[in-house]
A protein has these predicted regions:
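Membrane-embedded beta-strands that build the outer-membrane beta-barrel scaffold
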Residues: 26-36, 44-52, 136-142, 147-155, ...
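Composition- and surface-driven signal marking solvent-exposed, interaction-prone regions
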Residues: 1-6, 43-47, 61-64, 149-156, ...
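Transmembrane beta-barrel outer-membrane domains
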Residues: 11, 21-25, 129-133, 226-233, ...
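C-terminal beta-signal and terminal closure region of outer-membrane beta-barrel proteins
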Residues: 15-25, 70-94, 177, 189, ...
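Flexible, surface-exposed loop regions and adjacent strand-edge segments
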Residues: 3-13, 61-71, 166-175, 270-281
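Flexible, solvent-exposed coil segments and beta strand-coil junctions
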Residues: 3-15, 112-122, 207-222, 273-280
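Extracytoplasmic gating/loop element in the C-terminal half of outer-membrane beta-barrel translocons
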Residues: 158-251, 255, 274
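Conserved small-residue
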Residues: 18-24, 28, 35-130, 161, ...
Length: 302
């Protein structure tokens, strides 16, 4: 495993990349193909792929900062998966709607947090691996005379994702507000029914010059993690092969028409994602998904 380590100090760089860890991994994968029905006019075939993989870092020679361990890509410690996601322990909102946390000293705080800490990490909460442990697909092909229908589903389980880091102590008129803001703290007592912090006003920012730490910590806290599990309708295609007797007058060997739709929708995903796509995420959180694609194909054989 490649990572940053402190150099001897004789060169220009204080840190350098090196092999910093040892790890072990194991997994299994299998494919099952079946012919469910086969008659003169109708066929139904299925393909099922299942893959399970896990890994664990057994020895680590790198002191990562807290900010690296709580980012969306994940980091690691000995005894955990290679790409593990850790979070700051969110303890709910205070009476002013501000988020509170357990810091590196074990104290309850709003903004007394050190994201550059490399030693004290016991306060971090392990969420899970950012890489899925189970992946696979399930495809079904149906054929009736000249018609054919293909349904292809992909699935992934066992990982967690960091939600978009959209919360700030200050916003501008150009800021795009997330859906969660509908349920934010607005009145005293709301801290009993919501975990979405208040939109901090000017007075709050004046009273706490480090209030940005609180909202940044909220973005990387236990409140902003969702399961990465999903089942996706990856592809649906419908085609027709024209009969030979229809195309012979045109002196064609074959003629087919196919309509294909890709990346259609999620059959299942964590409701906490609020419409975000768990399959496409970046360092900060969940990224924009691949758009739906529709393709019409005409094949002509001369």
């Amino acid at each position: 495993m490649i990572g940053l380590v402190n150099s001897a100090g004789t060169g220009v760089k204080i840190t350098k990349y090196a092999n910093v860890a040892s790890m072990k991994s194991h997994g299994v994968e299998f494919t099952l193909s079946t012919k469910n029905i086969k008659t003169k006019d109708f066929d139904w075939n299925s393909d099922f792929i299942f893959s399970h993989a896990k890994n664990e870092v057994t020895d680590l020679h790198s002191n990562s900062r807290i900010i690296e361990m709580i980012s969306g890509t994940g980091f690691t410690m000995a005894g955990y998966p290679v790409r593990s996601l850790f979070s700051i322990d969110f303890q709910g909102l205070n009476q002013y709607g501000q988020p509170t946390f357990i810091n590196e000293s074990g104290n309850l705080t709003v903004s007394d947090l050190n994201f550059q800490e490399t030693i004290k990490k016991e306060h971090l909460v392990y969420e899970g691996p950012t890489d899925p442990t189970i992946t696979g697909s399930f495809g079904n092909t149906f054929r009736y005379k000249g018609f054919n229908l293909n349904l292809f589903i992909t699935y992934s389980f066992g990982n967690v994702v960091r939600l978009d880091p959209v919360f700030k102590n200050k916003y501008s008129d150009l800021t795009s507000m997330p859906r969660e803001f509908k349920n934010r703290w607005t009145l005293p007592g709301d801290e009993q029914v919501t975990t979405i912090p208040v939109i901090a006003d000017k007075l709050m920012n004046q009273q706490d010059s480090q209030l940005n730490y609180a909202y940044n910590a909220y973005n990387y806290s236990t409140a902003r993690v969702a399961k990465g599990d999903f089942i996706r309708m990856k592809e649906i295609s419908f085609g027709y092969d024209f009969p030979k007797k229809w195309i012979q007058p045109w002196k064609l060997n074959n003629l087919s028409l196919k309509l294909q739709a890709t990346n259609l929708f999620l059959i299942y995903a964590d409701k906490k994602l609020n419409g975000q796509d768990p399959e496409f995420f970046n360092t900060g959180g969940v990224a924009s998904p691949v758009p739906k694609q529709f393709t019409l194909t005409l094949r002509v054989g001369l």
